[in-house]
């Protein structure tokens, strides 16, 4: 009985520690076999891409002249990394649904680690819901990078917790954002730009769409809009 009780106490302490740290790299005992992390160390970096001369849905009046703007998108990118003595682990400071409350997520990626250049690696684009942010599937991003993928999660402008605008912008821009990010990363890959340039195999790309992200994906796969 004492052994059983002692094991229960240790298990409870472990759960409490993980909860306090908001760890995103914990694999539950009941998780399927493929949920385990892969063999690669993980790096993470943040980049911005800008879609120039994009229709500004929010500021275009009904029946009026179309407004345009430069649409900036922030990407969180996880990738296989070549660690040189760094200890795995990073902290993500995340805005929540209440913009006044920040959450701290703890993972195993290393910020701006040296890329492992034995690729190229297939690309996965992650598209969040409305509203949301690029960190909502950070656990998936880290996990896939450990298995040999480059994972790019988008902060969709006017669709994040701290930048939420009318849903009309999201309906119009979501599939366009996904396509623009793919094309931008393909260009980075083709020109071997920056440390990630030679890592990305943009010809082998998948998209993970959560909620409104799935809507954008369906449209990009050929699902059209109705006239209404």
Please report, for each region that a protein language model flagged, where it lies by residue.
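Domain-level recognition of soluble alpha/beta enzyme cores
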Residues: 21-124, 146
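N-terminal signal peptide c-region/cleavage motif recognized by signal peptidases
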Residues: 14-16
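Short substrate-entry loop that stabilizes the transition state in hydrolases
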Residues: 108, 112-163
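Positively charged n-region of N-terminal signal peptides that target proteins for export
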Residues: 1-4
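Alpha/beta-hydrolase active-site loop
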Residues: 136, 167-203, 218-219
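Gly/Ala-rich beta-loop-alpha elbow adjacent to hydrolase catalytic centers
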Residues: 209-213, 217
